[in-house]
Amino acid sequence: ADPARLARGLEAMHRAGIKYVCYTGGEPLLYPHLISSLAQARRLGLETLLVTNGALLTPDLIQSLSAVGLQTLIISIDAATEEAHDRHRGVPGLTSHLQEILPLILQANIKALASVTLSRLIEDLDALVDFVRDLGFTGLTFSYPLTGLSSSYLGCADNHLVSFSPEELDQWFAQILDLKKRSSFVILNPRLAVKEARRQLRGLPGRFPCLAGFKYFFADWRLEVYRCHFLADTLGPLEEIDRITPVRDNCNACSIDCYRDPSVFQYSAVSLADTLSAWRQGKVIRGFKSLLNPQNFLSLRSLMEGRHWLQ
C-alpha cells in the first residue's frame, strides 16, 4: 500500500469515527512502513491489532511494536502439534520460535491470541487448546474456512483441507460450543454467533444481521474499501471512507467470523441508536420496539462473554 495514501486513509478513518484497525495480509510484517503506520493509528486514537504467522517476530521488533502502542497480536496456528503446524506453514522451527517469543510479547504488554482456521489438520479440539496454551497464548479464536471470495482478498483456498459439507461444518460448530462449556481457556468466538452460524447452515432466518459495510469494512493493498472481503462490492478509496455511504441491508451471504462475531456484540448498540433516531423523528412506538427487542438482551449477554476483546 502506498504509505502516503495509507496515512491519509487513517486520517479519514479517524474523521469517520472508526475506533480500531486490524492489519492483516499476506504477512503485514513484510510491509516496510508498518511501524510508522501503527504509530499514526495510535496517535489518532485507533485501537490496533495485527495478524501474523509470527515467523518474522524478533525481540527488537516486538519492542518496536510495543513502543508504537500495538495492543493485540493475532498469530495463526494451523494444527495441534509442532510437526503438523511447521510442515503446513513451510517454516521449520516456527513452533519453537513462537514458544520463545510469546513470553516477550506478553512482557511487552501486547495481548497474544491464537487464530485457528477450522481444517482437516485439526483432529482434536482439546489437544489444540492444550497446544496453544502450552505455547503461551492467552486465548484463541476460531476462523471459519473460506473456499472462495469475490473481493481481492486472497485468504481462501478451494482445497480439501478446508472444504466441508454443511453437516461437517455444523459438527464443527457443535464441538466449539461444547468446548466453550468445558474449557477454562478463553475461546473468543461468542456462543450466540456460533449458534447463528448453525442457524444459517440450516436455512433458518438470522437474528443478528451482519454489520459489514455499516460498522466494519475491508481495505485491500490498493486501499480500495469493500464492505467486506466476501463480496465484490467496493465503496471507494480509503482516503474517502469518511464520505462513504454505509450499507445496511441485513446481508446473510456468509458466516465469516470476523464480521459476524462483532455484529452480535454490537447489535444492542445499533438498536439503541435506532431507538434514539426514531424518537428524534417523533416515532415513539417504533423507538420502543427497537429498544425492547429481545435480541438486545442476548447481544448484551454476548458482549459480556466477549469482554476479552475489550480488555
Predicted regions and their residues:
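Flexible mid-to-C-terminal extensions adjoining Fe-S/redox cofactors in radical SAM and related proteins
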Residues: 204-207, 222-311
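Alpha-helix N-cap/loop-to-helix initiation residues
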Residues: 30-31, 58, 94, 121-122, ...
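Radical SAM enzyme [4Fe-4S]-AdoMet core and its adjacent flexible, acidic
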Residues: 1, 47, 66-72, 76-211, ...
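Flexible, active-site-proximal loop/turn residues at the rims of small-molecule/cofactor binding pockets
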Residues: 27, 56, 79, 146, ...
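Conserved alpha-helical substructure of the radical SAM core
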Residues: 1-72, 311
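Residues that line or immediately flank small-molecule/substrate-binding pockets and catalytic motifs
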Residues: 25, 77, 144, 232, ...
